[in-house]
């Protein structure tokens, strides 16, 4: 349960080129910079907004994390990237005004205007984004050569996050937003969601036109954005069993019925024993005696079809626990896409070697 994901309640993209267009149910979220869109237009940009339920955030912190040290990350998964610079930076801020997602899509004819856009917070002609005389600690950013708007956000230095992508780097967004989430949880600021934007905008340079597109909550793929919570739930309460200290050794995973409903919680037991146990005089078989894996042991979960990590190895947040029976870990199935198969991997350190064990242990999440 040391990794738990919640999903957005609403998201949309704001385009300076189309200042009244709403894209609330588009499958794509986009942050981009366009130069020379036509001979008469100035550089244009786009930003996206994404919001998560305050009730869900509070529930996770109060009832699941329950006092442990935790971290939260905004995760968005890339759909397409073009014209990337050698380094492109994205920024994340907490939005300072409320907004409405709407039901538009990019390119709708006629244009849908029933939700947030570059100019408006709700629908065309309703509440405009503040563009001057900002409340203390908030700001906006736009070019005088385009329509004013584009959202407003808090500018306290601690309430921000960023990520820089090198040309060959993974382009998925994975930004630590713990301080922002904490501010929402404590009601220091209202939860109006995140705004994600490029660090450099409105630059009139034909060589700087990065487009980064991410899957939205309305995607028909297995890659919706999420707010991922991680915390250390490791408990070391060892009994009389020995620890594995030498190679080779064998590992098996028990208490895996193979099928789980979304939202269920399962404790997977990890049994280990030396491949060639030392012979002793006893009546029980040496091959039935369990051992603990070293305390520096971790689990990971992969999607069986895509071979991508859904939960990656993490020395702080996916560490195995120990009780009098065995090593183990507990897993909450809430963040897993239903009707898919997943693989369990174990990583441990023995005799100074980092060993990753893939023994083809699978499970499936089903709709319940």
Which positions does each model-derived feature cover?
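Secreted, disulfide-rich extracellular signaling modules
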Residues: 1-259, 264, 271-276, 285, ...
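Hydrophobic core positions of the immunoglobulin-like beta-sandwich fold
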Residues: 52, 331-334
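Internal, hydrophobic beta-strand segments that form the core of beta-sheet-rich folds
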Residues: 195-199, 334-356
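Extracellular acidic loop/turn motifs
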Residues: 275-282, 292
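Extracellular attachment/recognition segments
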Residues: 289
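Small/polar, repeat-rich beta-turn/loop motifs that tile beta-strand-dominated architectures
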Residues: 294-298, 342
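Short S/T/G- and acidic-enriched coil/turn segments that sit immediately N-terminal to beta-strands
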Residues: 326-330
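Short beta-strand elements
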Residues: 350-368
């Amino acid at each position: 349960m040391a990794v738990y994901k919640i999903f957005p309640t609403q998201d949309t993209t704001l385009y300076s080129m189309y200042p009244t267009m709403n894209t609330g149910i588009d499958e794509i979220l986009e942050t981009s910079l366009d130069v020379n869109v036509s001979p008469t237009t100035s550089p244009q940009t786009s930003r996206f907004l994404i919001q998560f339920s305050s009730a869900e955030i509070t529930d996770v912190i109060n009832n699941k994390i329950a006092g442990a040290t935790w971290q939260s990350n905004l995760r968005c998964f890339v759909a397409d990237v073009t014209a990337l610079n050698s380094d492109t930076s994205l920024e994340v801020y907490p939005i300072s005004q409320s907004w409405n997602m709407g039901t538009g899509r990019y390119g709708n004819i006629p244009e849908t205007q029933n939700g947030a856009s570059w100019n408006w917070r709700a629908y065309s002609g309703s509440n405009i984004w503040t563009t001057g005389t900002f409340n203390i600690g908030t700001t906006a950013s736009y070019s005088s050569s385009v329509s004013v708007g584009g959202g407003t956000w808090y500018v306290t230095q601690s309430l921000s996050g960023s990520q820089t992508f090198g040309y060959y780097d993974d382009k998925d967004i994975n930004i630590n937003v713990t301080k922002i989430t904490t501010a929402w949880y404590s009601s220091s600021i209202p939860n109006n969601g995140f705004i994600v934007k490029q660090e450099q905008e409105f630059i009139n340079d034909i060589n700087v036109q990065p487009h980064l597109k991410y899957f939205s909550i309305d995607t028909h793929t297995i890659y919706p954005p999420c707010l991922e919570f991680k915390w250390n739930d490791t408990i070391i309460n060892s009994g009389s069993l020995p620890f594995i200290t030498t190679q080779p050794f064998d590992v098996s995973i028990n208490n895996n019925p193979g099928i789980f409903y979304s939202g269920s919680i399962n404790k997977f037991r990890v049994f280990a024993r030396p491949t060639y146990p030392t012979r002793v005089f006893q009546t029980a078989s040496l091959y039935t005696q369990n051992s603990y894996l070293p305390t520096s042991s971790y689990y990971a979960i992969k999607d069986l079809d895509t071979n991508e990590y859904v939960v990656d190895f993490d020395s702080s947040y996916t560490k195995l626990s120990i009780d009098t029976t065995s090593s183990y870990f507990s897993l909450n199935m809430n963040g897993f896409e239903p009707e898919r198969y997943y693989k369990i991997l174990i990583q441990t350190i023995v005799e100074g070697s980092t060993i990753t064990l893939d023994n083809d242990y699978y499970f499936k999440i089903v709709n319940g």
